[in-house]
């Protein structure tokens, strides 16, 4: 029921895929090692008023209020969006970073992974693509459940949307004319096989070296040091996490590969022993996964980040703006930097009144609205207070060579506030990495 116009690809085809996969497993007589739940969530497009996080509400309610006990027990949530459309010559899977290695092995080395036929001529790319917030899997991911979704939104650069989103998305043109049977057949087979692979392997394959790589990529050592963060302690915690994660992954791979060998040989006794060993590793890894998302996953509104990236990014942008203003160049400041502050929320400050922005801010950060944030609960960033300067620069766009003392003062004050935030978040992340490494040992 939750769709725009026909909603054929988005998301009736996904509903059809889930039901077809359930029927195929049932008709084939497949006996899973674990419970496999087929779940269709409502309120995916919209489900709340006066909230900046008003989509994927049904999924958030399911994992947080209806079945919170699934966290720590669920091996994976496999989600689907627009699954019967050929977006390009390749396809991908978006996921939690900890699942990148498992998805790469499944697509490229696992003997029973289906290959595309009649679609996706360049195959399944497995460079590692972090899930975004535009689908139900993010609600599960943020809650601590390993999650995936077929690559439906962004091209492989993970910045540019597919043309579908310009031509058809949320319009009456998302209709049965877009259907590609070969794509649908492939997605049913591929993700059905992935579900069975995850179900059958004794140890859930989560690779926390990818989490360490994510944290490393998010570091700007110069800005962090400038803010007073203990960069050396942060890097030491990263090293400890990488070591613990590498050792844990080696255990998981050893158990799972041995299980595959025993299965091919029909060695039931070895399989039973490996499953027992894998069960303990799975429990340990799922707890570590939950902890990692609780402490190391943040948002800049709808963009997933490492928490310290928000103040780090703001400091960098504010410094660039100040440099432009000291050169008397407001046009460059506006065109290249000012509108991008606060994850482009400052663009709205340029074009809407302070009263409108106050409502938007209240929806995000108002004390009385914190129980209305859904998948943004406890992980949204703190906005930098630069609206007045943003608005002023937009008005003074053509004032080349002018005096921007007042605007510079606003950005300088913001930098000092953001430095304190950055130092605090770096400390919290250092402690979280240390705790995560301990969970993996």
Residue spans of the language-model regions?
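Secretory-pathway/membrane protein signature
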Residues: 1-441
């Amino acid at each position: 029921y939750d769709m725009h116009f026909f909603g054929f690809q988005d998301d009736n085809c996904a509903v059809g895929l889930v039901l077809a996969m359930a029927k195929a497993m049932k008709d084939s007589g497949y006996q899973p090692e674990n419970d496999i739940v087929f779940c269709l969530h409502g309120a995916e497009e919209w489900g709340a008023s006066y909230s900046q996080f008003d989509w994927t509400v049904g999924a958030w309610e399911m994992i947080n209020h209806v079945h919170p006990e699934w966290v720590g027990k669920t091996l994976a949530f496999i989600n689907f969006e627009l699954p019967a459309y050929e977006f390009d010559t390749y396809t991908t899977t978006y996921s939690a970073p900890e699942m990148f290695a498992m998805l790469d092995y499944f697509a490229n080395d696992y003997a029973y992974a289906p290959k595309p036929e009649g679609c996706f001529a360049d195959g399944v790319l497995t460079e590692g693509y972090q899930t975004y917030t535009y689908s139900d899997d993010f609600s599960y991911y943020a809650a601590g459940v390993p999650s995936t979704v077929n690559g439906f939104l962004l091209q492989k650069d993970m910045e540019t949307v597919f043309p579908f989103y310009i031509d058809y998305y949320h319009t009456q043109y998302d209709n049965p004319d877009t259907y590609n049977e070969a794509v649908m057949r492939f997605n049913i087979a591929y993700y059905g096989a992935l579900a069975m692979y995850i179900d059958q392997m004794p140890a859930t394959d989560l690779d926390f070296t990818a989490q360490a790589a994510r944290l490393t990529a998010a570091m700007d050592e110069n800005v962090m040091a400038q803010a007073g963060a203990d960069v050396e302690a942060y890097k030491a915690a990263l090293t400890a996490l990488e070591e613990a994660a590498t050792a844990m992954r080696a255990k998981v791979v050893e158990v799972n590969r041995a299980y595959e060998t025993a299965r091919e040989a029909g060695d039931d006794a070895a399989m039973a022993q490996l499953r027992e060993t894998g069960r303990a590793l799975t429990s340990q890894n799922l707890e570590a996964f939950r902890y990692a998302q609780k402490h190391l996953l943040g948002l800049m509104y709808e963009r997933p980040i490492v928490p310290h990236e928000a103040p780090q990014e703001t400091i960098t942008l504010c410094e660039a703006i100040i440099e432009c203003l000291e050169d008397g160049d407001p046009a460059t400041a506006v065109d290249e930097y000012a509108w991008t502050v606060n994850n482009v929320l400052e663009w709205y400050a340029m074009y809407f009144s302070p009263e409108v922005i106050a409502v938007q801010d209240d929806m995000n950060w108002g004390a009385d609205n914190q129980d209305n944030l859904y998948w943004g609960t406890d992980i949204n960033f703190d906005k930098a207070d630069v609206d007045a300067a943003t608005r002023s620069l937009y008005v003074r766009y053509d004032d080349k060579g002018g005096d921007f003392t007042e605007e510079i003062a606003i950005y300088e004050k913001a930098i000092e506030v953001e430095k304190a935030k950055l130092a605090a978040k770096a400390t919290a992340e250092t402690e979280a990495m240390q705790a995560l490494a301990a969970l993996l040992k």
